From Swiss-Prot:
The gene is SCP2D1. This is SCP2 sterol-binding domain-containing protein 1. InterPro entries: SCP2_sterol-bd_dom (IPR003033), SCP2_sterol-bd_dom_sf (IPR036527). One of its GO terms (cellular component) is cytosol. Pfam families: SCP2.
Length: 156
């Protein structure tokens, strides 16, 4: 059997901090970040800008029809290169670069080339999804409402 002991180890204090048995060595420099590419260098950037203008013009109508927040993660060679959010749930609608400010209802992870084919109408979204060309997480059924937004924009 184990015997309870009241033995407390004694540590001889030396110069320097000994709190919690670690020593703060100083700040670690941040790793150098690669220089970010300009947004305009991406093939899909003009399309996003155009859709953004369209949403600003007819956003209030789209908010009534769609009522969802979508996040588009555009990839190239398996890495996310662009992230855009289409907010058709709040206010009169908005589209902005970056992650969703509020939790997104649906998140799309799409290679840039597939995204371009989808928005230009060269590829059927349902067939592309079923073929595994892009991934959807969250409320998958809302993705069909985004298809309506892209078709609306194409007519514009």
């Amino acid at each position: 059997m184990w015997k309870r002991s009241d033995h407390q180890p004694k540590i001889k204090a030396e110069d320097g901090p000994l709190v919690g048995q670690f020593e703060v060595l100083g700040s670690v420099p941040e790793p150098a970040m690669p220089h970010p590419l300009e947004l305009s260098e991406f093939e899909s950037f003009p399309v996003f800008q155009d859709i953004r203008l369209h949403i600003r013009e007819v956003g209030a109508q789209l908010v009534k029809k769609v009522n969802a927040v979508f996040q588009l993660d555009i990839t190239k060679n398996g890495k996310t290169i662009l992230r855009w959010t289409i907010d058709l749930k709040n206010g009169s609608g908005d589209m902005y670069p970056g992650p969703a400010r509020l939790p997104a209802d649906t998140v799309f992870t799409i290679p840039e080339s597939v995204f371009m084919e989808l928005v230009l109408g060269k590829m059927n979204p349902q067939k592309a999804f079923l073929a595994g060309k892009f991934k959807v997480s969250g409320k998958v059924l809302l993705s069909w409402k985004l298809e309506r937004v892209f078709k609306d924009w194409a007519k514009f």
